[in-house]
C-alpha cells in the first residue's frame, strides 16, 4: 500500500517556526511576588533569592534559609561519604565466611598431594546482600540529590556539597583498610 505523504497532514501536528515563550514558573504560594522564570542559570552565582532546592516547594529566599540549606547539604554530603565507607565495612564483614575445600592431586613419584581451594560465598537472598542492596539504593538516591544540588550552580550550595564530601572523606576514610594481595603482579 502506497501512502501519500502530503495527504497525511503530518498527523495534525503544527510544524511552524513560531516563537514560543514559556510561561513564568509559579510556585504554589499565596504571594504574588513569588514567581520567577523557568530558565536555570548556566554559570555559577552567589545568591539566596528564588533558589530552588530539589523540589518546587523548597525555595530559598533569605540568608537564614540559605545558611540552613548549606548546613543540610553539607551534612548530606558527609553522610554520603560515611555511607560509602560503611558499605565497604559491611561487605568485608559479610565475606568473612571462607570455606576451604581440599582435593587430592597426583604428585611426583606416585605420591598424593592435597590441593586446597578457598571459596568465598554469599547467597543472593542472604540478609547481608539484601542490606547491601537497600544501602546501595539509598546511596544512589543521595548521589543524584547531591548532583542536582550542584547543578543549581549556586556557589553556596556547590561549596556545601564539596566541603561536606571532603569532610566526610576526611572523617570516615582515614581508617579505610587497604588490602594488598602479595600474589598480585600489578600493584
Swiss-Prot record:
Query: Where is the PTM Phosphothreonine found along the chain?
Result: 111
Attached carbohydrates are found at 19, 30
Cytoplasmic compartment segments: 87-129, 175-187
What is this enzyme's catalytic activity, as reactions?
Cu(+)(out) = Cu(+)(in); Ag(+)(out) = Ag(+)(in)
List the coiled-coil residues.
none
**Which modifications occur after translation, per UniProt?**
O-Glycosylation at Thr-30 protects from proteolytic cleavage in the N-terminal extracellular domain.
Q: Give start-end ranges for motif Bis-His motif.
A: 9-10
How is activity regulated here?
Copper uptake is inhibited by cold temperature, silver and zinc ions. Platinum-containing chemotherapeutic agents uptake is inhibited by cold temperature and copper.
| Residues in the Extracellular compartment per record | 1-65, 151-153
Q: Where in the cell is it found?
A: Cell membrane; Early endosome membrane; Recycling endosome membrane; Apical cell membrane
Sorted alphabetically, the Gene Ontology BP terms of this entry are:
angiogenesis; cellular response to cisplatin; copper ion import; copper ion import across plasma membrane; copper ion transport; establishment of localization in cell; intracellular copper ion homeostasis; plasma membrane copper ion transport
Instruction: Return the Pfam families for the record.
Output: Ctr (PF04145)
Positions carrying Cysteine sulfenic acid (-SOH) are: 186
TM annotation in the entry: 66-86, 130-150, 154-174
Q: How does it sit in the membrane?
A: Multi-pass membrane protein
Keywords for this protein: Cell membrane, Copper, Copper transport, Disulfide bond, Endosome, Glycoprotein, Ion transport, Membrane, Oxidation, Phosphoprotein, Transmembrane, Transmembrane helix, Transport
Kindly list the GO CC terms recorded for this protein: apical plasma membrane; basolateral plasma membrane; early endosome membrane; intercalated disc; late endosome; late endosome membrane; neuronal cell body; plasma membrane
Question: What is the top-level taxon of the source organism?
Answer: Eukaryota
Domain remark text: The C-terminal domain mediates copper(1+) binding and is involved in the copper(1+)-dependent-ATOX1 interaction. The C-terminal domain appears to act to limit transport through the pore by regulating the rate of exit of copper ions at the intracellular side. The N-terminal domain can collect copper(2+) from copper(2+) carriers in blood. The N-terminal domain, in the trimeric arrangement, tunes its reactivity with copper, promoting copper(2+) reduction and copper(1+) stabilization. The bis-His motif directly coordinate to copper(2+).
Q: Assembly and partners?
A: Homotrimer; is stabilized by cisplatin via interactions between cisplatin and the methionine-rich clusters, and could be crucial for the copper(2+) reduction process and copper(1+) stabilization. Heterotrimer between SLC31A1, CCS and SOD1; this heterotrimer is copper(1+)-mediated and its maintenance is regulated through SOD1 activation. Interacts with KDR; this interaction is induced upon VEGFA stimulation leading to SLC31A1 and KDR subsequent co-internalization to early endosomes, thereby activating KDR downstream signaling in endothelial cells.
Q: What is this protein called?
A: High affinity copper uptake protein 1
